[in-house]
Amino acid sequence: NISNGTERDFAKIMNQYASKLQMKNTSFKNASGLPNRAQMTTARDIALLSHALIKNFPEKYKYFKQEKFKWKGKIYKTHNKLMLNYQGADGIKTGYIKDSGFQLAFSAKRNEKRLIGVYFGGDTGRQRDKSLKIIMDKVYGDLNLPTTKKEEKEVKIKIKNNSYAIVVGTFKYKKNAEK
């Protein structure tokens, strides 16, 4: 327990951590991520949080790639269908809120190159997964790494580190992203 036991206190701690990560457009109001008019974030900020999770908490990150787990006698299965079908996938989190549609924070690692993709605004979970898969494949292709497609092309780029982030739809509301 890292708070005084209240959700408000927990959200305060989350906001302090978000500030340390330079998540400049995020305000947490609850621990669940369920809708709250005062709670907001961006795809960029979720990418920062995802990167910090992977880097700073590797012992906890293993839980984000589980296909299923058992809790109090009940088996729970992941909603992250892309993770089940994407080469190198190892997590992170799906979501849905009416105002911003189907969302996904996603990570994959191939040949020691990790990509973090964050997608907001999907009309369906399937459409969200398909769109993010296309983007991830494109970036891996540009890095000249294996993709889930069989097409090959040679691209030369200079790489400074092994972490990349893809941010799509950095809008609070889906309707703004479509303008």
Residues covered by each model-derived region:
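Substrate-binding clefts and substrate-entry loops adjacent to catalytic sites
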Residues: 1, 26-29
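LysM (lysin motif) carbohydrate-binding repeats in extracellular/periplasmic proteins that recognize
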Residues: 176-179
